[in-house]
Amino acid sequence: MIQSGEYYGKDDYYSRTLTKEDFWYGHGLLSPLGEDIPNPYQDISTPLTHADYEQKRASMRKEFSPDSKKLAIDLTFSPPKSVSIAMLDPILKYQLIEAHNQAVKNVLTYVESNYIIWRKHTNKGNKTEHIKTQNALFACLQHRVSREQDPQLHTHCLLFRKTMVDGKIMTIEDRFIHSNQYLLSLMYDNELSKALQERRIPLRESNSLDQKNKHFEIDGINDTLIDHFSKRKIQIQQYQDTYGLSDSWEGSHAAGLASRKAKSTEKLQDLEKMWLQDISELGGFVVEKRPEKTNSTRLLEIDTIVKNSINLLQEKSFAFSKADLMIEVYKEGMMMGITLPEFEKSFDAHLQVDLIKAGFRTLNNEVYYTTPKNIARAKYIDTILLQERIENYATLSAENAIDKIDTISSELKANYGWELSKGQKEAVTKMLSTSDKYVAIEGIAGSGKTTMLEQAKNLYQEQGVKIIGMAFTGKAAEAMETEAAIPSQTIHRYLNQLSPSTPHDTWDFSAVKKADTPEVWIVDESSMLTDHLLSNILKASEQRNAKVVFLGDPNQLLPIGTGNAFARMTLEGAEQVPTVRMREINRQEEGSN
């Protein structure tokens, strides 16, 4: 359970000069959820007092079972460090708090409209439905100090895990909120950027330490001041490095939760005096407001960002959600500060031209979209894989291949005490004896794919066939080369070699010549291929006239099954290419996969 009392009063609540820093928010205020909260204007936002908060916390606990561990979900929003520093200027202080609160409320409105979901289960037909109730109650508690005693404005938005459904108080299905925290963080950043610029606060672009993520700071607050007051950020980064957490937003978020410690109880006024002294010693700061101006091309610029984001996503996957698109748009448009209404307007326009509904994914309760280009690409893949061919791509007859692989298996048994599994034998036989140009091998982890590839490579080389390995990741390519002795590299690197004069990911294979001797390409990690990458492998292999063996793990499919080419080509009962399924776990040699 979130001990909300621990979040309250840490910044010396009773010494604050502002009277409306903390507030209730949400349509729950206008329902039985908020009937015991003073709300004289019957609004979806009203001031929060300590007494009312404690009373609501106690009454809300009664709505949960005694063993319930979680009363509320904490959504915390914090501006860039320069905002917290600039707040020490009394002229800017109230405007910055106002901009922060505006951004917070806009995000909470989106959360309430989209992610307050009740799970309805119907025994008849055993069906589950996720219903958006659009009714939430947030307790928003504003703090000013980081855990390392640095200035850091932030608001804990405690979402009570109850909502109203048909006049009854029901429990929220909170996984939709947890899975969209990155989106909500980016949305807050954009809303804040826009709110600050509306108040003529000058912004400058700033990058993360790894130079991967764009961000912004207030112009006039230099990096020396920011670094001086960022002890908590440095602490989180050190925790990530020490424990090997990724340098992504998710890694930073996890490190922040794992490394946090209790705040001290020093008074805010005393801390502010100390901060001002530090600022003075470091040269101070001056924030000069910018003159008011209008941007006549703003909507066009936003539309371009949305279009570019669609293009980016269609190269990553066949289908993507609206939330996926929002993330890309918000990352690119942060300096502009793209608001939700502006995004929605552009999205609706593109929905008529560039986006096609691909289906609904129950797992995250979202509609998925694809593009005309992705539809055409998928059709091309299906056409190439399914077309009948005159040329025979077999290296050995089925009988000859079986004899050879049986002999190899017997020799392994005699020399090492183990033999090839049924799945391994079938895979090698199919690779060498089928007349088809494209073959798929589906193998789970531990099924002995590496051992199988090594034996196939030996038989191919005996027949004078050149075998080329490639994989989605460099690690897998290296493993294929060192463990199966197949010369290998990443797919991107190999395609770049075939089309050296074209930009990355925009290959042109029209000048590629047919191979002088038979070639077989082994494409490992095929279950991770996007349609974009697979279509280019097919184009290159058609020009080169190479046989292609797609090797994939059914347990490592891309997150979205729709449009996943490997899943489509190996669909049981409707295979597009000859497919062997290796499902036996083998313990033939150390490191076998």
Please name every model-derived segment.
Residues 1-593:
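Conserved ATP-binding/catalytic motifs of P-loop helicase motor domains
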